[in-house]
Amino acid sequence: MRCPFCRHDDTQVVDSRVSEDGAAIRRRRRCSACDKRFTTYERVELALPAVVKKDGSRTEFDRRKIVASMQLALRKRPVAADAIDAAVARIEYQLLASGEREVRSEKLGELVMNELRQLDTIAYVRFASVYRRFEDVSEFEDVIEEFRRAAPAKTPRKR
């Protein structure tokens, strides 16, 4: 594998382990030329459905777009990169399991929101505000109220 830092072709695998609920192999590599380390992921490549956008155009499913949108929603939140990768892997699995050749962008957005809801409620609200195009504060209040109804009552923390 080529080093991303110096572009040298000779790198060694330092460590390998299964990650993302068994969906990928995480490898730590070291470049023999510049001695820098980097991480690679090896995963099975499967044919995911095409994404049908709101305007009717079609595009290939792009895992990087899903990861980027989740990272943006999770910015400065205490969620590990592995948790994001696992969430995206679950989305991909759901899409593959559906057996559909196409998925509407709205459905994909809902899958992302479901995963964010499990990872971090703040990120969920951030993503929902953009995805659902919130126009005023009352829409934020509605989502927050939804969480309050769904969450069991918590006892106040002592300070």
Swiss-Prot record:
GO molecular function, one term: zinc ion binding
UniProt entry keywords in alphabetical sequence: ATP-binding, DNA-binding, Metal-binding, Nucleotide-binding, Repressor, Transcription, Transcription regulation, Zinc, Zinc-finger
Cofactor(s) needed by this chain: Zn(2+)
GO biological process, one term: negative regulation of DNA-templated transcription
Cofactor note: Binds 1 zinc ion.
Coiled-coil segments: none
PROSITE patterns reported in the protein's UniProt record: ATP_CONE (PS51161)
Zn-finger region bounds: unnamed: 3-34
UniProt keyword NADP, yes or no: no
UniProt keyword Zinc present: yes
Residues in ATP-cone domain copies: 49-139
Family, as annotated: Belongs to the NrdR family.
Function: Negatively regulates transcription of bacterial ribonucleotide reductase nrd genes and operons by binding to NrdR-boxes.
NCBIfam families: transcriptional regulator NrdR (TIGR00244)
Protein name: Transcriptional repressor NrdR
Organism encoding this protein: Burkholderia mallei (strain ATCC 23344)
Gene name for this UniProt entry: nrdR
